[in-house]
Design a protein with these regions (language model features):
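Core catalytic alpha/beta fold that binds nucleotide/phospho-ligands
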Residues: 1-161
């Protein structure tokens, strides 16, 4: 399950938690269970088989809920990034795709949301430089939603946005 909303004056945390509460209630008919934080900082329900992930930008919050490990990351399409970051965060394969891309800003944002979602999925976060992960610019797990690039990754099948 996927939900998104504009922040409308709320913090990303507040909006994300509101989305999570709504999704969990819709999926289970139950109130939101307690949330604990793992050793590497990944939040999880302490007594539920459901998994969730939240991401927010300056304008939007996104939440996914599933019965398998799942992760989401989002970036506003109009966000301008320092393109020199490509040298530090992209694998050689990704760098070749980045160099060939007509829209380098979008290319870097695409790789970034995939790397962030992958790090969230693992539960370990990004440690060191994330250039040891390799993705493709045409990865079907990245979609446009509400003016954002959104990546959703699961342990199992691709989650359709």
């Amino acid at each position: 399950m996927l939900a998104c909303c504009a922040l409308n004056g709320r913090t990303g945390h507040e909006a994300g938690r509101s989305l999570l509460t709504r999704l969990y209630g819709e999926a289970t008919g139950q109130p939101l269970p307690p949330i604990e934080v793992g050793a590497w900082g990944k939040p999880a329900f302490s007594d539920s088989d459901w998994h969730f992930s939240i991401s927010h930008t300056k304008k939007h919050a996104f939440c996914v809920l599933a019965e398998e490990n799942i992760a989401i990351d989002a970036e506003e399409l109009d966000r301008r990034v320092n393109l020199s970051l490509a040298e530090k965060i992209l694998s050689p394969t990704e760098k070749a795709q980045f160099d060939a891309a007509a829209d380098k800003n979008r290319a870097l944002l695409t790789f970034w949301v995939l790397k962030e979602a992958s790090a969230k999925l693992s539960g370990r976060g990004l440690h060191g430089y994330p250039n040891d992960m390799a993705f493709s610019l045409d990865d079907p797990r990245v979609r446009e939603l509400e003016g954002c690039l959104v990546a959703i990754l699961t342990e199992g099948e691709t989650y359709a946005v």
